[in-house]
């Protein structure tokens, strides 16, 4: 039997979340963000489920788009960081990948690299995040260059990204939305601004195309709301099993550094999962896992391959019992808060040795 640490991906949850997105953004096209191996959920598992149900897949780079094509998936892909060299343009157009242009070097490469077919492009404009994107006053010149380039498809899109959408009260959100909506340069056939948080909090930002990421996988983009609050279902269940159980005397120290001990006899379960699998090492006291229909607290330090749980009050738990580290019952948002991070990071840091099932 192989090591029990695994990811269980729920296609029905993925489709439920997509339905929720379409309910929140009726009539809008959907670009499903599947960068970083579909936020750790596995592009092999996710892309075939969404194929034909969305407008396009959003990826970070050419390699991620090619991995989707290798699955036999025909839905278009958009390279959100565009190309990193002029050589990538020919590969992109041959595979019908659209490219985001966000700086002058990319535009120059495109204008100076004749292509056999028209390539679809999106122009990214900086409205306040100050990370990627052309300045607003540069857009007229950019559009002029694209419209005169014979190997650029005329369905040019315009997009921007909100810096603070996960904090809806921040005034920067409406400032960015207003700046974007005020852009009146002709030639842009479709517009996009809304990520997961904006889809939920700023309906006026939905424009023509929305770009859900984290909410597609059943995780909240907000610190003060979880997936259940938003009607989302977690797609990823991070699972393992109990590999050993020990009855310890009073004051027995558990784990590295002996950071946990009980003043009474204790029953300690060992779970086959640790930070080598992507579970966070630094978590707050009494962070739970789910065993036999209840929460059980982690005790002691998380190690590379194992963590330990307090079974003193749970005599029915046995070796081999299934353990949910996060997922349907223990939401990843809760573990992220305990670890002082965000759900995005935890999903994306699952290690390669964890198998998908």
UniProtKB/Swiss-Prot annotation:
Its EC number is 5.1.1.1. InterPro entries: Ala_racemase, Ala_racemase/Decarboxylase_C, Ala_racemase_C, Ala_racemase_N, PLP-binding_barrel. GO terms for biological process: D-alanine biosynthetic process. Substrate binds at residues 131, 304. The active site is at residues 35, 256. The keyword Membrane does not apply. GO terms for cellular component: cytosol. The modification N6-(pyridoxal phosphate)lysine is found at residue 35. Pfam families: Ala_racemase_C (PF00842), Ala_racemase_N (PF01168). Its cofactor is pyridoxal 5'-phosphate. Catalyzes the interconversion of L-alanine and D-alanine. May also act on other amino acids. This is Alanine racemase. It comes from Legionella pneumophila (strain Corby). The lineage of its organism: Bacteria, Pseudomonadati, Pseudomonadota, Gammaproteobacteria, Legionellales.
